Amino acid sequence: GRISFQDSVKVSRWASKIGGHQVYLKQGEVFQLRELMKAIVISSANDASVAVAEHVSGRDKQFIKKMNERAIELGMKKTRFFSVHGLPPGRGQKLDESTAFDMYLLAMELLKHPQYLRWSSTRLDSFRNGTFQLLNTNHRLIRNYRGMDGMKTGYHRRAGFNLVSTAEREG
């Protein structure tokens, strides 16, 4: 069926065990899809990424397949996803691969969705009915770079520091 921000998403055991940046989801908790998407965009919540992938596709591996299909549709010729969260690969897993140009293509697609840009430019927001604070991984840039209105940061040892950002100045 059709996916909606109002969908209820039940957290699986697997999603609750994902590390890195997280919102500490617990197995069996239920959230609106909107809340999990907000946590992903604002605070890079890897556990929420897995919960959303499972909700959309049943299994994260099926969602990764959809991610790669969509990347091809967008013309991202040198991108290959092996995870839904971008964390360093575990033993026997491959590292996600992309280029700056391919990430530009993805960013241009995301700009077609105003809610994404609103979330990615939000410095601080609440989660879990106000009991947990989402701090944007871009918070220093949003605060200190005039016109910065969002997108995404990333880091792990093998990939290094990564940034896709947008800014608007003088219209």
PLM features: residue spans?
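Penicillin-recognizing serine hydrolase domain
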Residues: G58-G171
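Active-site-adjacent loops and short helices of periplasmic peptidoglycan-processing enzymes
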Residues: G1-F101, L111
